[in-house]
């Protein structure tokens, strides 16, 4: 069967103009105009999607099939073009019958042309074919427009769904134009209103806890250098030149007080010969207050020292991915659970704004993984927020999963974030050693977000940074009072 793309080529019908006209009509629709006014950040994201829309429309036109009736009429037209005028006159009754049978829009006009002219001349033959071609072009154009209209309705429906989703999540997740673009890309999934309302709910909770949002931004955009802890830092040799007096005097450099008899000034020696001043001379000698010549030489020598190496490679805007481990034990339930989930949502916001990856791992007895910054990030975030914190605590498995993840090339500059109350068993020595190696050799940073003031110091000692957000009733009341 003939395709629409082939038909357009045969009849020299250009679909580019129709595609552009349809895109402009879509952008001028009231729904999009109102949406762009309300969410200006998403306008650039939608505009960047125009190329994909054009390609989708061209592909739809290219693959569309022409109706059998129109295909048969086009084939008859092509064959008629090859006939001479006498041959065409012989075939004319069959052509008129075919047009009538196919209910062609040109059937009535073709019959009128034939009946109104008793003699079928070559000029009439040319006119007949020209008008027939014009009728076919009109039919092809109408078919293109019908398909584009169907696609426009479908595209507008999809865009409206994505606009609704993006508009709901924009205040929570879109901090800048880059985040708005990634949010728009992620909105292409099949989501229902009830699904993403969970993100809206935790976004409202996060807005009610500004200290939690501020903590996430400080952690995500920390400008501190990646430093190696001093107790584990390797020693390096440093060589410096030191200036010091030589052992052999070279020249008179001035006068000083002292007890060097060989370098006494003549007036001091004169007092020794006066009986009344002799005791005064000895007193000043004992107290090293006699005036003497200062004879100095100079020398330079190389001084070799060893000291711990502290790396100060300042990473003003870290761009590595986040590996976030969330404790889902029973002690992290209730308000702790809400804060942990909202904090992860805040890190997702930072990751989208800075074009970073955000990888979530839940640890209790098993490790569950979610990628919040991928193409299906919204769906993954909904699944994560739907989890319940009712398991045990196996923080060692969490660290082993982090260590394993950091071995990959794409995670070489990742920052690890562990969210817990840190009320757990001590870490095995091999885990502590491996974490120290990652910090020392690869400058990976390990952050702790402590949800309790009673975390075990032995566990928290291995972290580069400890960010405290006490969820106790007293701390919650103090935070509310300070707002």
Swiss-Prot record:
Q: Which UniProt keywords apply?
A: Chaperone, Cytoplasm
Location in the cell: Cytoplasm
Q: List each coiled-coil range.
A: none
KW Chaperone (keyword) present: yes
Q: In its keyword annotation, does this UniProt entry include Chaperone?
A: yes
GO CC aspect terms: cytosol
Protein origin, superkingdom? Bacteria
Describe its partners and assembly state. Answer: Homodimer. Interacts with RavA.
Q: What does this protein do?
A: Component of the RavA-ViaA chaperone complex, which may act on the membrane to optimize the function of some of the respiratory chains. ViaA stimulates the ATPase activity of RavA.
Instruction: Give the protein family.
Output: Belongs to the ViaA family.
UniProt name for this protein = Regulatory protein ViaA
> What is the organism of origin for this protein?
Salmonella paratyphi A (strain ATCC 9150 / SARB42)
């Amino acid at each position: 069967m003939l395709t629409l793309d082939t038909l357009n080529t045969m009849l020299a019908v250009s679909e580019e103009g129709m595609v552009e006209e349809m895109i402009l009509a879509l952008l001028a629709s009231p729904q999009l105009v109102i949406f762009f006014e309300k969410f200006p950040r998403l306008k650039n994201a939608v505009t960047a999607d125009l190329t994909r829309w054009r390609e989708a429309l061209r592909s739809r036109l290219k693959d569309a099939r022409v109706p059998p009736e129109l295909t048969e009429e086009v084939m008859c037209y092509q064959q008629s073009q090859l006939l001479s005028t006498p041959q065409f006159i012989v075939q004319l009754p069959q052509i008129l019958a075919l047009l009538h049978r196919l209910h062609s829009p040109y059937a009535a006009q073709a019959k009128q042309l034939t009946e109104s002219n008793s003699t079928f001349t070559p000029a009439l033959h040319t006119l007949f074919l020209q008008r027939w071609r014009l009728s076919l072009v009109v039919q092809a154009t109408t078919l293109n427009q019908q398909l584009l209209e169907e696609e426009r309705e479908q595209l507008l429906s999809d865009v409206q769904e994505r606009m609704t989703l993006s508009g709901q999540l924009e205040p929570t997740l879109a901090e800048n134009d880059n985040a708005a673009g990634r949010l728009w890309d992620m909105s292409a999934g099949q989501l229902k209103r009830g699904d993403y309302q969970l993100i809206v709910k935790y976004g409202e909770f996060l807005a009610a806890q500004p200290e939690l949002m501020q903590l996430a931004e400080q952690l995500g955009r920390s400008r501190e250098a990646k430093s190696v802890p001093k107790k584990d830092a390797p020693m390096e040799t440093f060589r410096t030149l030191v200036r010091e007096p030589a052992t052999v005097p070279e020249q008179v450099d001035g006068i000083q007080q002292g007890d060097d008899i060989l370098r006494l000034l003549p007036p001091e020696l004169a007092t020794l010969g006066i009986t009344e001043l002799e005791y005064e001379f000895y007193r000043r000698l004992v107290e090293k207050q006699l005036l003497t010549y200062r004879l100095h030489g100079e020398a330079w020598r190389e001084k070799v020292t060893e000291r711990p190496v502290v790396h100060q490679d300042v990473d003003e805007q870290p761009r590595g991915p986040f590996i976030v481990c969330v404790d889902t034990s029973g002690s992290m339930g209730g308000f702790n659970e809400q804060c942990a989930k909202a904090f992860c949502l805040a890190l997702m916001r930072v990751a989208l704004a800075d074009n970073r990856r955000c990888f979530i791992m839940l640890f209790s007895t098993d490790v569950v993984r979610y990628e919040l910054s991928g193409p299906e990030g919204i769906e993954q975030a909904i699944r994560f927020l739907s989890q319940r914190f009712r398991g045990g605590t196996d923080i060692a498995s969490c660290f082993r999963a982090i260590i394993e993840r950091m071995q990959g090339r794409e995670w070489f500059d990742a920052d690890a974030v562990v969210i817990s109350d840190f009320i757990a068993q001590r870490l095995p020595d091999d885990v502590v050693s491996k974490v120290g190696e990652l910090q020392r050799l690869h400058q990976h940073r390990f952050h702790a977000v402590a949800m309790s003031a009673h975390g075990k110091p032995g566990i928290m000692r291995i972290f580069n940074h400890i960010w405290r957000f006490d969820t106790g009733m007293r701390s919650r009341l103090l935070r509310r009072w300070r707002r």
